[in-house]
Amino acid sequence: MRLLSSRAARVSGPSGSLCALLALLLLTPPGPLASAGPVAAVVRELRCVCLTTTPGIHPKTVSDLQVIAAGPQCSKVEVIATLKNGREVCLDPEAPLIKKIVQKILDSGKNN
């Protein structure tokens, strides 16, 4: 009977590939569950997204606007603007300029 060293030991057959796959899965770190920006990409935590808000922003710098209604995750309405440079900014939904921008978007949606 010949003993193999740990370096020379081999596992053959389907159980060897199964063990290798299992080892690979165990060693693979999980992917990110949320983005670093104010809005989570995959998982949204049960809390407010916006911790601080900006009272105004120039409308020409905004490429997208997202309004999150109050709900179980947050008791206040949140307005998040994605700027043309890719940054996301939380806006104050009570600011007069922001109210005008949101109303203009809502009105244009009704006309379509």
Curated annotation (Swiss-Prot):
GO biological process terms held by the UniProt record: antimicrobial humoral immune response mediated by antimicrobial peptide; cellular response to lipopolysaccharide; defense response to bacterium; inflammatory response; neutrophil activation; neutrophil chemotaxis
Subcellular location, record wording: Secreted
Induction comment from the UniProt entry of this chain: By interferon tau and phorbol ester.
Gene3D superfamilies: 2.40.50.40
Disulfide partners: C48-C74, C50-C90
Highest taxon of source: Eukaryota
Membrane-spanning residues: none
Keyword set includes Disulfide bond: yes
Keywords: Antibiotic, Antimicrobial, Chemotaxis, Cytokine, Disulfide bond, Heparin-binding, Secreted, Signal
Record's signal peptide: 1-36
GO CC field: extracellular space
Family stated for the protein in its record: Belongs to the intercrine alpha (chemokine CxC) family.
Functional summary from the UniProt entry: Chemotactic for neutrophil granulocytes. Signals through binding and activation of its receptors (CXCR1 and CXCR2). In addition to its chemotactic and angiogenic properties, it has strong antibacterial activity against Gram-positive and Gram-negative bacteria (90-fold-higher when compared to CXCL5 and CXCL7).
Protein name stated in the entry: C-X-C motif chemokine 6
Species assigned in the record: Bos taurus
GN (gene name): CXCL6
